[in-house]
């Protein structure tokens, strides 16, 4: 029998403008320092920023399966530890304090790690391209992890829609790891329990923005309640309709959205003429965000041109985000 989920009264929602993410990993570090420094969590990055196109973290997560197909829950694959990157250490003490002459090398020898292919992208100069894709738990409206859990350990908080794993109820079945198509629940081998992003709900309860959002130096992130018509997330998703979920075909109805990137045209054709083709192939963006991305790119281009001509654009003002308080719940860190 499928687990019964009560619809939340409100839904906390995130938007990231991929045109402003600079790949600095400040959000990654903020999340890591706050939540995953315990035993068995070395390899976990509840929040990570990966280069797209690329293998991602864990490797090849986009092909692991899970989610829903025709409304039916799908079983995916549990990524092996090598796909996350086996944690490694450096023998600094031996070199600095014990007189060892060998070079300081990581042990064990790393074969994979988060951002293993950072900044590689695709294509050849001068038309090579990539962009940064920050990822976290999507706190889905239809979370596959919740339905898959055999111990009813996963629930969606009534007050904010954040999806949480009840640690006392979790028995380490890993059904959530297997069923999430975004590979965002992690199995803690020390605690024998699943861990995942908790949406910084202790901060939300105090009226403070999540750590990843508050620390974003590129001012790329927005967070708020989708029913708040004054919030930037409501405006970007519902009013201007320029923010889209990642892989909507997975069927979980994510509550993390993205403003797709605009990188401009390719540099030159072989005959020396300028190209009108976009540097990022449209098919690539459609593969990530669905067919609607074409309309969104057209809206962004129109509004950008208005702003360049000195005309007013409410949408661009929201995206620029001159005041942190307009982009999020209290930005206090």
UniProtKB/Swiss-Prot annotation:
Compartmental location: Periplasm
Biotechnology: Has potential use in bioremediation of waste sites contaminated with perchlorate, a common component of solid rocket fuel which is a widespread environmental contaminant in water systems in the United States.
GO cellular component labels: membrane; periplasmic space
Residue numbers binding [4Fe-4S] cluster 3: 137, 140, 145, 180
Region feature Disordered, mapped onto this chain: 101-121
Residues noted as binding [3Fe-4S] cluster in the record, renumbered to the chain: 149, 170, 176
Keyword Cytoplasm: no
Pfam name, any one: Fer4_11
UniProt name for this protein: Perchlorate reductase subunit beta
Protein purpose: Component of the perchlorate reductase that catalyzes the reduction of perchlorate to chlorite and allows anaerobic growth on perchlorate as the sole electron acceptor. The beta subunit may be responsible for electron transfer to the catalytic alpha subunit PcrA.
UniProt KW keywords: 3Fe-4S, 4Fe-4S, Electron transport, Iron, Iron-sulfur, Metal-binding, Periplasm, Repeat, Transport
Free-text comment on the cofactor: Binds 1 [3Fe-4S] cluster. Binds 3 [4Fe-4S] clusters.
Amino-acid positions noted as binding [4Fe-4S] cluster 2 in the UniProt annotation, renumbered to this chain: 31, 197, 200, 212
Annotated ranges, domain 4Fe-4S ferredoxin-type: 12-40, 128-159, 161-190
UniProt binding sites for [4Fe-4S] cluster 1: 21, 24, 27, 216
Lineage: Bacteria, Pseudomonadati, Pseudomonadota, Betaproteobacteria, Rhodocyclales
């Amino acid at each position: 029998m499928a687990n019964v989920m009560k619809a939340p009264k409100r839904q906390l929602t995130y938007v990231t403008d991929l045109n402003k993410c600079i790949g600095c990993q400040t959000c990654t570090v903020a999340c890591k320092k706050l939540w995953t420094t315990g035993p068995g969590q070395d390899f976990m990055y509840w929040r990570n920023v990966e280069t797209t196109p690329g293998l991602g973290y864990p490797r090849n997560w986009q092909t692991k399966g899970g989610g829903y197909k025709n409304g039916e829950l799908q079983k995916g694959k549990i990524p092996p530890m090598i796909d996350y990157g086996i944690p490694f250490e450096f023998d600094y003490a031996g070199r600095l304090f014990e007189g060892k002459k060998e070079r300081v090398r990581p042990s064990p020898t790393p074969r994979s790690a988060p951002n293993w292919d950072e900044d590689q992208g695709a294509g050849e100069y001068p038309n090579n391209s990539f962009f940064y894709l920050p990822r976290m738990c999507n706190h889905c409206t239809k979370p596959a992890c919740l339905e898959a859990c055999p111990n009813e350990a996963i629930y969606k908080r009534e007050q904010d829609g954040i999806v949480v794993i009840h640690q006392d109820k979790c028995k380490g079945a890993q059904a959530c790891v297997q069923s999430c198509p975004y590979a965002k629940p992690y199995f803690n081998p020390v605690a024998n329990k699943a861990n995942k992003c908790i949406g910084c709900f202790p901060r939300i309860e105090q009226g403070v923005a999540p750590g990843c959002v508050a620390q974003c130096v590129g001012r790329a992130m927005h967070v708020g309640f989708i029913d708040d018509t004054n919030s930037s997330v409501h405006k970007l998703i519902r009013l201007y309709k320029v923010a889209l979920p990642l892989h909507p075909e997975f069927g979980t109805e994510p509550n993390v959205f993205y403003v797709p990137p605009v990188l401009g045209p390719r540099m030159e054709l072989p005959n020396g003429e300028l190209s009108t083709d976009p540097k990022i192939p449209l098919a690539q963006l459609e593969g990530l965000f669905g067919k609607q991305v074409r309309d969104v790119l057209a809206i962004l281009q129109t509004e950008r041109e208005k702003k360049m001509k000195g005309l007013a654009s409410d949408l661009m003002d929201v995206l620029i985000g001159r005041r942190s308080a307009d982009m999020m719940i209290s930005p206090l860190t």
